[in-house]
């Protein structure tokens, strides 16, 4: 049964009231943004908003921002096996994924506090009847949403990846002119992030490599960064390895802005302007969430 079918028969409204209530009680966030954050533990940033799709149009600005941050701060459960196959400890990936849900909400609320009254599903508030004739009609509409989202995401990714490649090409040309070899956007960010990696608890001698990996994750994606990590894993101490693995565990990269614009914008076109306006801020908040998880992991492992 697809998500649209579950909404049609009323199952999703019950799930929102119950599952979303757990994080709501702990953090004081709304049911819908809490459920979206929880869903990101199991599915990707493109699929999680579908869980609260009927509520997207009526979400407050803070709730919408929290949905965006939650998607970027986490990784999909379906990709964990792939990362584990690279040699990344599965227990670290699982811990980072579960920490991303409250961490993403925390950073989202710090950067975009709630100033409006959210919809209260626990009181029966929410969208009106969906208007579908039966389950088949609801399933067909859900399938069309999926195809529309996939096409929009593909188009946005092509544009963003092309833009990043253009910037790297320009930096490479500038480097050759001024005698700087292998100048790239991720390399520049690696130098920038070296002090940050040191602040997270990575020794200065290892901070350059750690900062470079964080830069690769931000500019490219976490998969590329994890592959690069496996090639230099021997350079890190156990605590540094944990910090790096936690810092890389999230979809917080430039391409994710394209995925949000294409995916979330396709199912909530009335909020597209806000989604595009919040893209970089959501990326910053999600990155801070990942770095906070990394710092906590390094602290507890060093104490153990």
Task: Tell me what each language-model feature is.
Residues 26-84, 210-296:
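Alpha-helical membrane segments and immediately flanking helix-loop junctions
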Residues 98-149:
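Long, contiguous bundles of hydrophobic transmembrane helices that form the permeation core
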Residues 17-51, 118-138, 183-189, 213, ...:
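Juxtamembrane inter-helical linkers in multi-pass membrane proteins
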Residues 144-233:
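Transmembrane helical segments that form the transport core of multi-pass membrane transport proteins
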Residues 92-107, 242-250:
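Alpha-helical transmembrane segments
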Residues 14-28, 36-40, 54, 137-148, ...:
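Short amphipathic alpha-helical coupling elements at transmembrane boundaries
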Residues 1-3:
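Short, small-residue-biased leader/transition segments that mark boundaries at the very start
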Residues 296-304:
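Juxtamembrane boundary at the C-terminal end of a transmembrane helix
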């Amino acid at each position: 049964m697809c998500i649209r079918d579950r909404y049609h028969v009323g199952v999703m409204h019950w799930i929102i009231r119950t599952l979303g209530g757990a994080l709501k009680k702990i953090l004081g966030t709304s049911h819908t943004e809490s459920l979206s954050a929880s869903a990101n533990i199991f599915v990707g940033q493109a699929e999680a908003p579908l869980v609260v799709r009927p509520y997207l149009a009526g979400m407050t600005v803070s709730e919408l921002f929290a949905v965006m941050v939650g998607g970027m701060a986490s990784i999909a459960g379906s990709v964990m096996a792939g990362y584990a196959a690279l040699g990344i400890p599965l227990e670290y990936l699982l811990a980072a994924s579960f920490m991303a849900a409250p961490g993403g909400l925390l950073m989202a609320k710090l950067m975009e506090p709630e100033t409006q009254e959210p919809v209260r599903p626990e009181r029966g508030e929410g969208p009106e009847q969906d208007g579908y004739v039966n389950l088949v009609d609801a399933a067909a509409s859900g399938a069309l949403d999926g195809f529309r989202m996939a096409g929009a995401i593909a188009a946005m990714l092509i544009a963003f990846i092309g833009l990043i490649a253009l910037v790297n090409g320009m930096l490479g040309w500038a480097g050759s002119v001024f005698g700087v070899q292998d100048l790239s956007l991720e390399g520049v960010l690696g130098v920038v992030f070296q002090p940050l990696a040191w602040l997270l608890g990575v020794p200065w001698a290892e901070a350059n490599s750690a900062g470079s990996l964080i830069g690769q994750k931000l500019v490219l994606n976490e998969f590329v960064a994890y592959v690069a990590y496996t090639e230099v894993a021997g350079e890190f101490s156990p605590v540094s390895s944990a910090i790096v693995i936690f810092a890389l565990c999230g979809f917080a990269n430039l391409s994710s802005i394209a995925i949000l614009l294409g995916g979330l914008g396709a199912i909530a076109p009335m909020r597209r302007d806000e989604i595009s306006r919040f893209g970089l801020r959501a990326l910053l908040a999600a990155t801070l969430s990942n770095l906070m998880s990394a710092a906590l992991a390094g602290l507890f492992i060093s104490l153990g």
